[in-house]
Design a protein with these regions (language model features):
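Active-site hotspot residues in diverse enzymes, especially metal/ion-binding acidic/histidine motifs
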Residues: 1-98
Length: 98
Protein backbone atom coordinates (compact mmCIF):
# COMPACT_ATOMS: atom_id res chain seq x y z
CA UNK A 1 0.00 0.00 0.00
CA UNK A 2 1.27 3.45 -0.90
CA UNK A 3 1.51 5.94 1.97
CA UNK A 4 3.12 9.36 2.39
CA UNK A 5 5.75 7.67 4.55
CA UNK A 6 6.56 5.05 1.91
CA UNK A 7 6.85 7.67 -0.85
CA UNK A 8 9.22 9.73 1.30
CA UNK A 9 11.28 6.63 2.12
CA UNK A 10 11.53 5.67 -1.57
CA UNK A 11 12.77 9.18 -2.39
CA UNK A 12 15.17 9.35 0.57
CA UNK A 13 13.26 12.20 2.19
CA UNK A 14 13.23 12.41 5.98
CA UNK A 15 9.78 13.02 7.45
CA UNK A 16 9.56 14.83 10.79
CA UNK A 17 6.75 16.42 12.79
CA UNK A 18 6.38 19.73 14.62
CA UNK A 19 3.87 21.20 17.05
CA UNK A 20 1.88 23.42 14.72
CA UNK A 21 -0.81 24.55 17.15
CA UNK A 22 0.56 28.10 17.28
CA UNK A 23 1.25 28.55 13.57
CA UNK A 24 -0.64 28.53 10.31
CA UNK A 25 2.08 26.38 8.71
CA UNK A 26 1.00 22.88 7.73
CA UNK A 27 4.28 21.70 6.30
CA UNK A 28 7.56 22.72 4.76
CA UNK A 29 10.23 21.11 2.60
CA UNK A 30 13.86 21.85 3.48
CA UNK A 31 15.98 21.11 0.43
CA UNK A 32 19.34 21.33 2.20
CA UNK A 33 18.27 18.67 4.73
CA UNK A 34 16.07 16.80 2.21
CA UNK A 35 13.40 16.79 4.89
CA UNK A 36 9.67 17.45 5.12
CA UNK A 37 8.39 18.84 8.41
CA UNK A 38 4.65 18.35 8.97
CA UNK A 39 2.31 19.81 11.56
CA UNK A 40 1.61 16.91 13.94
CA UNK A 41 -1.95 18.14 14.55
CA UNK A 42 -3.31 17.65 11.03
CA UNK A 43 -6.04 15.11 10.40
CA UNK A 44 -5.23 12.17 8.11
CA UNK A 45 -6.56 13.78 4.93
CA UNK A 46 -4.74 17.07 5.52
CA UNK A 47 -1.59 15.17 6.47
CA UNK A 48 -1.59 13.24 3.18
CA UNK A 49 -2.26 16.37 1.16
CA UNK A 50 0.53 18.31 2.87
CA UNK A 51 3.17 15.59 2.55
CA UNK A 52 2.38 14.94 -1.12
CA UNK A 53 2.37 18.70 -1.81
CA UNK A 54 5.75 19.15 -0.12
CA UNK A 55 7.22 16.24 -2.11
CA UNK A 56 6.32 18.34 -5.15
CA UNK A 57 8.89 20.94 -4.05
CA UNK A 58 11.82 18.49 -4.13
CA UNK A 59 13.00 19.50 -7.61
CA UNK A 60 12.43 23.23 -7.10
CA UNK A 61 15.28 25.74 -6.78
CA UNK A 62 14.85 27.60 -3.47
CA UNK A 63 16.71 30.63 -4.84
CA UNK A 64 13.98 31.00 -7.47
CA UNK A 65 11.03 30.56 -5.10
CA UNK A 66 10.14 34.26 -4.73
CA UNK A 67 10.18 34.78 -8.49
CA UNK A 68 8.45 31.51 -9.40
CA UNK A 69 6.21 31.04 -6.35
CA UNK A 70 2.94 30.63 -8.26
CA UNK A 71 4.47 28.12 -10.69
CA UNK A 72 6.11 26.13 -7.88
CA UNK A 73 2.94 26.02 -5.78
CA UNK A 74 0.85 24.89 -8.76
CA UNK A 75 3.39 22.17 -9.56
CA UNK A 76 3.37 21.02 -5.93
CA UNK A 77 -0.45 20.93 -5.96
CA UNK A 78 -0.40 18.84 -9.14
CA UNK A 79 2.03 16.48 -7.45
CA UNK A 80 -0.33 16.18 -4.48
CA UNK A 81 -3.27 15.39 -6.76
CA UNK A 82 -1.19 12.82 -8.64
CA UNK A 83 -0.39 10.90 -5.46
CA UNK A 84 -3.94 11.15 -4.06
CA UNK A 85 -5.39 9.78 -7.31
CA UNK A 86 -2.78 7.02 -7.27
CA UNK A 87 -3.79 6.11 -3.69
CA UNK A 88 -7.46 5.92 -4.67
CA UNK A 89 -6.63 3.86 -7.75
CA UNK A 90 -4.57 1.37 -5.73
CA UNK A 91 -7.31 1.12 -3.10
CA UNK A 92 -10.00 0.67 -5.76
CA UNK A 93 -8.00 -1.99 -7.63
CA UNK A 94 -7.35 -3.95 -4.44
CA UNK A 95 -11.07 -4.01 -3.69
CA UNK A 96 -11.82 -5.43 -7.13
CA UNK A 97 -9.68 -8.49 -6.46
CA UNK A 98 -11.67 -11.26 -4.83
Amino acid sequence: MMTPESVCAERGIDLVYFDGRDTDKKGIYNKRANMIAVNAYLDDVQYRKVVYHEIGHVDHDPSQYDRRREQYELQADRNMIHYLVKEVSICHNSRLKY
